[in-house]
Amino acid sequence: MFLVNSFLKGGGGGGGGGGLGGGLGNVLGGLISGAGGGGGGGGGGGGGGGGTAMRILGGVISAISEAAAQYNPEPVPPRTHYSNIEANESEEVRQFRRLFAQLAGDDMEVSATELMNILNKVVTRHPDLKTDGFGIDTCRSMVAVMDSDTTGKLGFEEFKYLWNNIKKWQAVYKQFDVDRSGTIGSSELPGAFEAAGFRLNEHLYNMIIRRYSDEGGNMDFDNFISCLVRLDAMFRAFKSLDKDGTGQIQVNIQEWLQLTMYS
């Protein structure tokens, strides 16, 4: 077993997927109708290489302490069939359920390819969002970190949770793109991440900029969303493993590989 020490600082605001958010049904309705709508370090040898390996690990692992304690997203709901309508569902949720049936295909699940097509159709209707488009590898990663039952696809509740977050984070992105460049600059990034519910330390911000931003430190929309989806998933994973709330977790090698390889 190895101990993952706390890495982040401060308190995140309320994140997560509470409710569908304003205009979600309209956005997807527009999509259907056509309306506008730093990589890991090399392994050290045995014995004397342990200290170096741990220092590298400490700089890479996004272990979550105080920030995770104050980040309280709703858990991804259990998978249910899209047609299982609950009596207390709002009309907006029911409308989303009907649209999901059109988007998901015959198996009523959203694959990485289907997610990529959906997201790229949406962003083409928002010329103010600078993006190279959502690639298949990005969408595979997004599906993996949201795939609570490891089917390789997103069911209705999983997709609804993801979509709700994307809509919320799109609003944050536009709010903090103060120079209207279509990107988030390195100076705008901390405020944007805090508004999205994540308050990180400077070291992790620098890591994120190197991983998700261009050479000028600017982050476009697809990288912004991809990064936040990953952060949300890592926060939730850490909180689920930190059962006693100490800000530390212990995982064995199999648990670590499962957590990191399918993401």
From Swiss-Prot:
Top-rank taxon: Eukaryota
Any GO MF annotation of the entry: calcium-dependent cysteine-type endopeptidase activity
Annotated binding of Ca(2+) 3, by residue: D177, D179, S181, T183, E188
Span of domain EF-hand: 91-125, 134-167, 164-199, 200-228, 229-263
Any one Gene Ontology cellular component term annotated for this protein: plasma membrane
Binding-site list for Ca(2+) 1: A104, D107, E109, E114
Cellular location(s): Cytoplasm; Cell membrane
Its job: Regulatory subunit of the calcium-regulated non-lysosomal thiol-protease which catalyzes limited proteolysis of substrates involved in cytoskeletal remodeling and signal transduction. Essential for embryonic development.
Subunit structure: Homodimer or heterodimer of a large (catalytic) and a small (regulatory) subunit. In presence of calcium, the heterodimer dissociates.
Protein name: Calpain small subunit 1
Species for this entry: Bos taurus
